[in-house]
């Protein structure tokens, strides 16, 4: 009986399902999928359930997209070994910015996949593109870009350990524009102080 009380308290205080899903996603990826190059696209699968929907119980709510992107990012780090290499240098990774474009809803009980790809990097951050694609029609329902700030180590040094990153790709045009918007926002916030 006391373990039920502890479990109930944990569910009230923490989002236990989030942590269970993180562990499951990372370990399932490591156990059942082959390692990937850091430049490869990684894929996880999901299903829009009753816990993911908006108040009208018809489609995934916007907050859940961001949560699912976390799982896909952790999976990417695990399969490519990137987080281990960052951690070996006593570094860390934190979300610096993200932008999601919602193109069409993901209806309740529809399966989907999230594809994650490293699209560019500089000395302080890596930039990922992630796409939500419904399995029934192959339509890209949402696309996200995220800036992963790498702390306490140099990204260029970390990525030198991957032969496939010897040549950095050109910065995609939409990434340039997004980074410009972030810089403008930063300048405005500095002026407001």
From Swiss-Prot:
Glycans are attached at residue 149. InterPro entries: HotDog_dom_sf, THEM6_lcsJ_thioesterase. SUPFAM superfamilies: Thioesterase/thiol ester dehydrase-isomerase (SSF54637). It is found in: Secreted. Keywords: Glycoprotein, Secreted, Signal. Its main location: secreted. It comes from the Eukaryota. Belongs to the THEM6 family. This is Protein THEM6. It comes from Drosophila melanogaster (Fruit fly). The lineage of its organism: Eukaryota, Metazoa, Ecdysozoa, Arthropoda, Hexapoda.
């Amino acid at each position: 009986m006391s373990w039920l009380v502890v479990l109930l308290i944990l569910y009230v205080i923490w989002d236990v399902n989030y942590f269970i899903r993180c562990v499951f996603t990372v370990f399932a990826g490591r156990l059942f999928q082959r390692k990937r190059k850091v430049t490869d696209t990684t894929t996880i699968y999901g299903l829009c359930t009753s816990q993911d929907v908006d108040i009208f119980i018809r489609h995934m709510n916007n907050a859940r997209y961001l949560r699912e992107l976390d799982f896909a990012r952790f999976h990417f780090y695990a399969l490519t070994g990137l987080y281990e290499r960052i951690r070996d240098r006593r570094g860390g990774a934190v979300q610096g910015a993200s932008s999601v474009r919602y193109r069409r809803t993901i209806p309740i009980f529809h399966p989907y996949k999230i594809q994650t790809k490293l699209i560019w990097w500089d000395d302080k951050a890596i930039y990922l593109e992630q796409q939500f694609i419904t399995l029934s029609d192959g339509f890209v329902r949402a696309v996200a870009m995220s800036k992963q700030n790498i702390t306490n180590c140099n990204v260029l040094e970390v990525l030198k350990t991957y032969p496939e990153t010897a040549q950095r790709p050109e910065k995609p045009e939409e990434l340039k524009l997004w980074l410009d918007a972030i810089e403008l926002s930063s300048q405005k916030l500095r002026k407001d102080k």
